[in-house]
């Protein structure tokens, strides 16, 4: 019973934290009609898409956040010694966080359903295929960025500062990046392209410059994938056992 109450309390707190972002948008649009040409429904769709992307990441890939911890306490040695692919072991071992992100699924899907109807977002199988493609690439991009930052633990044992940077950038992309200075737009589009997790997919679904943005998304995901592999291989070579 105590466990169930803790579970409910944690999820309720998480839902309330997510709803703060929704309430902030509602408050802003109670004062203005548009945010840099973005309507309230479009901004909420963008936020809901990001919640869904993060929920999928937290379901399947959250163990990448524990790379630094495993390196520090020596558990990473166990992955290397086993006759299995090290990366596969990282993803398939016991979850870093035992609770599944039901809150992010619920709030994210609710926002998408509610706003998609008002925006007439889905109008045929093509739009559904496009949505699935954008969701997959957004999750991959989000995973890749966090994986790269976590893999820096091979050189910087305490790499939490890099994850903190990502968390701060996440707060920025809760709103369309059009509202920010050009320097910030470049930072979240090219340097650390976390805007791939929701802004660019949203623009694509809204039909604004879809072809060029699709090429950018696909190209960026390929580049991120290559960087993932290179950094991982370099890190594995640089790794020194805690018992060495």
Locations of regions flagged by a protein language model:
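Hydrophobic transmembrane alpha-helices and immediately adjacent juxtamembrane helices
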Residues: 1-244
